[in-house]
């Protein structure tokens, strides 16, 4: 089951129906990755910089907000619990403006990025980063987004 929690009303001023948008991106990503039949449990928090700053400080010891954080469950159950994703509308807006990226494309990118982290992908090493970025590009292209600028 996919659960979307809107924790900041700014999301509703940018996307007419944030829950449907998020569910569409995540479901299409799972389909593109050919794992949609597993029906994983994922919770997505549509938040702001305040919450992402707190989470980033608590879990990564970084004293600043960030665009997206993923919290994979340590032990998967039979129901395929993948984990939680938190995403900040404030940072997304700032980065969209700074890098001239359409905001919906950037939101989709950060959702895909967070999902890939839940699935075990990482970008700490160069070879891992290449694999993850290629997957992001493929998924975003299937959604109609061009990731050239990112």
Curated annotation (Swiss-Prot):
Predominant subcellular localization, coarse grouping: cytoplasm
PROSITE patterns: UPF0054
Function comment: Single strand-specific metallo-endoribonuclease involved in late-stage 70S ribosome quality control and in maturation of the 3' terminus of the 16S rRNA.
Family statement drawn from the similarity comment of this UniProt entry: Belongs to the endoribonuclease YbeY family.
Cited Gene3D superfamilies: Metalloproteases ('zincins'), catalytic domain
Official protein name in the record: Endoribonuclease YbeY
One GO process term, biological-process aspect: rRNA processing
Domain of life: Bacteria
